[in-house]
Amino acid sequence: MTSLLTPLGWEFVTERHLATLSTHSADGTIHVVPVGFTLEDATARVITNGPSQKVLNVRRNGLASIGQVDGGRWLTLQGTAQILEGEDEVAHAVELYAARYRQPRVNPLRVAIAITVTRVMGSAGFIV
C-alpha cells in the first residue's frame, strides 16, 4: 500500500515530525495522542508503554490512524493494528524509531503498535 507514496511522500514520513495516533476508546470516542512513528513498507510502527490506553484500545478494536501535519503538508495512514510484544519485534521498532528521532530511554514494559496500512490520504504530491 505504501507504494502509493511518491518520493516526496516518503521524504515527508522520514522528516523529524511528531504525529497523532487515533484509536477508538471503549465508549466509542476517539482517543488521540501525540506519537513518533516510523513507516517501513506497508507497516507503520509506534513504540509505547504496554499498559497505555492506546494499547488497550488497539487490543479491543484493532483499528488505528496516524496523522502527520507540517504547515500545509499532511499525511494520514489508516489500517488494522496489532500489538507486538516479541523481543525481536520490539527491538526492530525501537531501531527504526531511533533512526528517525533519537534513541528512546530503556523501558522494560515497551511494546510496539504495528499498523498495516490499508488507506493513505495526504497532500498533493505525496500520493501516486
Model feature map: region roles:
Residues 16-49, 58, 64-67, 76-77:
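Short beta-strand segments
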Residues 17-18, 63, 102, 120:
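Generic structural signal for secondary-structure transition and capping sites
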